[in-house]
Amino acid sequence: MKKMDIKAQDILNFLTKKYDLSKAEAWDKNGLFFDEQQTINNVQIALDITDDVVNDAILNNANLIISHHPLFTNQDSNDEVNYFVNIDLIEKIKKNKISLIHLHTAFDASANGMSMQMAKRLGLLNLKQDEQNPYLVVGELKLGVSVDYISRIIKQKFLSPIIKYNNVFRLETNLKKIGIIGGSGYKFADDAFNRYQLDMLITSDLKYHNWLDAQAKKQNIIDMNHLSESIFIDVIYDELTKFYGNDANLNKSLSIIKINYI
């Protein structure tokens, strides 16, 4: 930050007016970690907390990282030791006095959260966030499209490295009613199709047996890859820029897991 003395807690307070922490799942780590009263120099915004992202923050003199996904810290406990798989990264964060803000399911479940942001970027109309399942947003396209067409739009808008869909539905060209669940949402598929009579559900992270299940139920699903959630970076960047104006010194990090497909 340049002109104003802004604390990490100030930024959290601003963001949580739109993305209420009370909406977060009980198992999820949302909120501010490490030093809430730290005066912020610069801010790094990312999808995940990785070594590359932390290095970017250090390079940019950023002492606050805002991420969608919490720092991965699987813990194995016994009577003698607590072992965190990311202990080296945690130590690097502490050494460089970097605070963290995570907005995961608190962001996803908000009225203008992940699925709603995705639906708007795809140009869906008559948008509705489901009252029973806040992660589900349903909308419509003015003109019917094919799976192939909407997949290409998703890849362009969300920077998804790979899009998957069942070839059974490839020839259908009048798909209009679409449900979106950002992240891993296949477990909600049955409910979404049954209550909304969807032509298509767009989500991520389907496993082999999920595809078998979806085909047996004649459910048309697009797997847009979890990296599609990288739109979080732009959303938070824009929100902070509008609020803080020239006082904000914001940086973006997109850390992509490099997986080869043969």
Swiss-Prot record:
Key word Metal-binding present: yes
Highest rank taxon of the organism: Bacteria
Name recorded for this polypeptide: GTP cyclohydrolase 1 type 2 homolog
Organism: Ureaplasma parvum serovar 3 (strain ATCC 700970)
Cellular component per GO, a single term: cytoplasm
Signal sequence range: none
Family: Belongs to the GTP cyclohydrolase I type 2/NIF3 family.
Pfam family, one: DUF34_NIF3
InterPro entries in the record: DUF34/NIF3, DUF34/NIF3_sf
Binding site residues for a divalent metal cation 2: 69, 226, 229
Residues noted as binding a divalent metal cation 1 in the record, renumbered to the chain: 68, 108, 229
